[in-house]
Amino acid sequence: MRVITGSCRGKRLVTPDGLDTRPTTDKVKESIFNAIQFDIEGRRVLDLFAGSGQMGIEALSRGAKSAVFVDNSQKSLRCIRENLENTKLQSVSEVVNVDFELYLSRIKDKFDIVFLDPPYNKGLIEKAAAKLYDVTSDFCMLVCETSTTDVPPDEMFGFCVYRRYRYGKVSVSVYKKGQSNE
């Protein structure tokens, strides 16, 4: 796994050992960032269920202003910190060791892009979306990765689907805040 483009292009990223995480493939990641490439520059990013932190790191490499990485796995947090050190992005990053619900209930910041890639088939996208409205900017985008058997609804908690993509058994849904695709 690597950073695809930007200031950290080609840097290798480590991933947590074991079956607890399922890193986004380079192909899927590249497709996601091609779809949102004009919405990254200067934005504040939240990488929820961050795993290796690769989505937030890719956004930073492409010009995002800052990123917060939230995960409650010690293995994941070690990888995120190592990846941030390797890419020299620590100064524009925050790594938070807490459950996503607790984090979302306490923060006052507003995010412009939120990456959601939780464990599949547990309803966590909807649980997170229910708490994200108040901590996101008016032009926020949610980028949700799920299995194709558990695609979130077209509208959820003030976010409307903008685009959907399918890559084998992976589905990516991009939502915009308060905006339908019509």
Give, region by region, the residue ranges found by the protein language model.
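Class I S-adenosyl-L-methionine-dependent methyltransferase catalytic core
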Residues: 1-182
